[in-house]
C-alpha cells in the first residue's frame, strides 16, 4: 500500500523511481523535496522474484501516482529514474499513462569510475 503523508494541494512534483535487480521503489515528492507518497513492489504484495518484474514496476508506479493525484491533485511531474533493474521502461510508461504531464525524464543512475570491486559472478 502506498504511504501517503499530508493532504495539501501540490500541482508540480517529482517522481523518483529506483529499479534494482530485486525491487522497485517509487517516491513522489514536491519541488522542494518533501515526500508525499512512497511505495515499493514488496508493499504492493509482490513477493520474491516477482518484485523485480516490469509488471510489478508498472503496478507500483500506478498505485503511487493514483494516490498522489487523489490526495494532492498533482498534474505535472518530472521523472528521475535510477538503477539497472528490469522495470525501468515499464515504470516510465506507467507514469505517462496515468494522466500526468511529464516535463522531463532524467537518468540519475550512479556509475563508478573504477571504484569498488564487483561481486563475483554466479556459477550455476
Curated annotation (Swiss-Prot):
Name of one Pfam family that matches: Ribosomal_S11
GO BP terms: translation
Any Gene Ontology CC annotation: ribosome
Domain of life: Bacteria
Keyword Ribosomal protein among UniProt keywords: yes
Key words of the record: Ribonucleoprotein, Ribosomal protein, RNA-binding, rRNA-binding
An example molecular function term from Gene Ontology annotations: structural constituent of ribosome
PANTHER family (alphabetical): 40S RIBOSOMAL PROTEIN S14/30S RIBOSOMAL PROTEIN S11
Function text: Located on the platform of the 30S subunit, it bridges several disparate RNA helices of the 16S rRNA. Forms part of the Shine-Dalgarno cleft in the 70S ribosome.
Protein name as annotated: Small ribosomal subunit protein uS11
Organism: Anaplasma phagocytophilum (strain HZ)
Gene name of this polypeptide: rpsK
